Amino acid sequence: QFSGDGTSSVYTLGEKEVDSVLWVKTDGVETEGWTADTQNGTVSFAQGSIPQKGLNNLEICWEKASTAKERIITKCTAGMNFGGNTDTRVFLYGNPDYPNYRFYSELANGLPSAEYFPETNYTVIGSSTLTDMVQQYDRQLIFTEDRAYYSYCELRTDALGNYYPSFPVYNLNFEKGNLIKGCAAVMDNTPVTLSDDGLNRWISTTVQDERNAVCFSAPISHTVKHILETGNAKNCCIYDRQSTGELYFSTPYGLYIYNYKANLWYRYDGIDAVQFCEIPGRLYWLNKEGKLYYFSEELTQDENGVITAYWCTPVSNFGAKGKKFDLLSVAVDTDNDNGTDLTVTANPNEIGQIMNSQTVSVDRNNSLLRRFFFKTEIKRVTAAKVIISSTHENRQADIKSITFKIKNKEVER
């Protein structure tokens, strides 16, 4: 669009060496009396056809096919919708030839378009590769491996006094960023990324402040440290499962789940997910071999075998405070639906051999609440753990409490 002044007969396009000028309109009506210089990118009007003075009253449409310029957009590997109250623009990044560039679309005839990317709609952000962009309310957070920026839609005024939307970029944090490409999550309206010190929640994204990212992964700090030391961050992914209030952190060493409603961590073995997707009622995950799986609470078999459910305590001294003790017995109280078998195993330590294992059965006809009790032979240890497992396909039990009896030189309890 151009604003005619009533006297100018030559208007310069935004590009040179265009393929053709398709049409020219004045006040919305297609007009004649013009010629195009496609080599120099200009349109000239004959006397009597010069556009009258007006605001955005002249429209010139031209085309220029450029495979190289198309690839600037089509080689981008990630993107998001953002801009205004209804996210009217597409923001793209991840072009390996332009690793620190952000490209964004423009409205076409006042409507959102995923096909119209003006040549000037880009931002160069720092000097490092962009790893992710996520939205928090009206802010767009932009990450590299060691820095964070933010952007938002800002109305600005041009030389003629016209308002136009702009998306400036501001510094947010010079120490922390996102190490996993394309895997930042938004947990309970708070962005989450993996940084050099662990998983971080971005609690304040309005101004630059080194305290706006807070690490919350201390309970799995040893695993995170090993991931960073071995360069395995690229093999991890983060996913927020809003329906259950859980954050999934998939690593080469297991799937760690943070229940942010209960502030608890737990781990699943044997899951090497590289991507998650939830369809209402079912969570799917893709492994690095391209196989698709889903989680189910109804299935009792997996790969033609009965699923073993188990729970284990942390390695603990059970209050012995570093002194050697004997683990005399373990008692497990369960609330049974239809009877079950439980195997209770006591280990002297996390990597030691099984010292004592006992399988006990409960018939529902006997009692709805039953205590499983067995003595152990673990003696003179400084730490131990207990594992409770069940391989029944159609029986279950809710564990209500576990009681340990220990003895050392000072006390028996």
Task: Identify what each model region corresponds to.
Residues 1-38, 45-47, 62-77:
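Extended beta-strand solenoid/passenger and fiber regions
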Residues 2-3, 31-38, 79-83, 132-133, ...:
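Short, exposed beta-strand/loop patches in secreted or surface proteins that constitute
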Residues 5-10, 53, 363-369:
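Solvent-exposed, conformationally flexible loop/turn segments
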Residues 10-13, 44-48, 368-377:
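Exposed aromatic-hydrophobic patches
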Residues 24, 55-62, 384-389:
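Short, well-structured beta-strand segments within conserved domains
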Residues 49-54, 377-381:
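Surface-exposed, short loops/turns at beta-strand junctions within beta-sandwich domains
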Residues 71-235, 264-270:
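Beta-propeller and closely related beta-pinwheel folds
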Residues 176-180, 186-190, 196-413:
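Beta-sheet repeat architectures centered on beta-propellers
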